[in-house]
């Protein structure tokens, strides 16, 4: 009982809500740019996708954070997941400075669905060695749905959904362009993006080309980290037709990432990270080993108005190819090719009295093929579909929402028998032939109630479903980028989640505050654990530690709190705190906590908007921010899988201004210094934390990026 009381008390103290951006509008001007001022717009003016279709944020019973265009533009980052990782309840699993995986309330990988251009992104997201294949510059705004969101998105949305919204279509008769360029000092990151969009008599288009390159990053303990350089290129073209009866949009997207692979090997005497003779750590060129990721995407988006309702049909094709080059630049070892076809058909009714109903079907077909000489997973084929119905109802000061969904998924993995190097030895069976079918039901029921004109109470109960992915079921190979050899388990059962969310939102002219609590019970929670032999020694396969997937019942509790106080018109003081306690039930002490649980985190900042004449400079601001990660003592210790992570605090400084000429904005300039004190630290979710020990200092692993100065210029062009 004492444990329960402590957990409830901790939830009450630490729990939370959404980010400051929840109070931001999402309207953009004709150049896809927003002014720099912080506005305190009421929550009932913000419209989000939600779990049951478009609705006002204030009426959504589920916890949702919104990241505005202004925040994305002004916040320095190395990729799109890094850009949103400062939102309460959102973290990132990193492998160096350029690779990030999203984590929502302690859960990541295939438990977070990423939606872009209206469809779920499919890029072999079970892997650690690559991030989300989306150009950060192409994202206009972001919605983060926290908690089981399987109603609209199906299996895998157990932790939540991240919706990356592209820029809205320009008003009729308008054209606009945008040029962006930035630089970061620590890893020499240089990025740029060119955008041209328009709307002529209903013919709409949006074109964007972006590029990015970075050399090895550095920190106080490791110096330059060999293998952390990367290059990125992307191109997007949207063409469409808007008419009175609806719209048809075709979006073509290409993304290419070439990241290095950090191996963490050191000189035993000096502890310095090993580099090839004559290697220049500031080189932007490719150095072995490295990866190559190509992602192609074509999305056809159709919508037709039917009376006051509408029908929407989405169809998409994605091709993801991931290659690893270890010994030669011309011949890859690992070569995975994934084909995905997405489909989504749904109908949204007009208002039927106080009710609005949506129903539909969506799913995907996949085929993955090994084209290289090394293997992680077998060739496989997957098909799934989901039938869903949702409803919302507004009664006086109360808004009700809910729905049900049924999912079916079938997955078949092919056998693979390899030739043995020894002609006299038997052939080796790498993968066995197998087929699995998974069925699951999801549902939610929630309420948002206006207690007072500025105070809203929210409660939501949701149940989700997640089928095991191909890596969890059948992997048998080494992850070069994380130095792990992983073994799957074809007997794994689907995860089933049931979560309770409680929240309070308060908004006034002086204070904005959000509080969100959650308690989540998951059956058959799947994770990997390090294998040990009968003597307690780590099992080594092909030179790497060996991990195998297993499952157990889990309970996650916690929340986020956000408070923004602006006692003066130009002064904003913001604080947020995030906490999650992730426990595996019925286990001994060393296996009590789930792996990769983010540490408790406090984010605070003081922002002052400087008064200008408005003729040359406008919307000028300066902001001092603190990022404090507390010590993480709740870790999965079985087999030495994880270790405790010390606390650390980062001090950051940001500034920005609009530059005007003849009453028009001609540019926006942003500058920052992150990690001002050049603190050497490791985040608990960093994959590099568990690399080789530096025998000269006794420190384990590779540390995160040190002090980093950034500058960014955005030039809007009206045509």
Where are the regions that the model predicts?
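Cleavable N-terminal targeting peptides that direct proteins into the secretory/outer-membrane pathway or into
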Residues: 1-33
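Outer-membrane beta-barrel proteins, especially TonB-dependent receptors
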Residues: 24, 36-42, 50-67, 71-75, ...
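Active-site-adjacent helical/loop segments in soluble small-molecule enzymes
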Residues: 84
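A short linear hydrophobic-aromatic micro-motif
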Residues: 89-93
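Short, solvent-exposed loop/turn segments that connect beta-strands within catalytic domains
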Residues: 613-617, 661-666
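Localized edge beta-strand/strand-to-loop motifs within extracellular or lumenal beta-rich domains
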Residues: 657-658
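Gly/Thr-rich phosphate-binding loop signature of adenosyl cofactor/nucleotide-binding cores
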Residues: 673-675
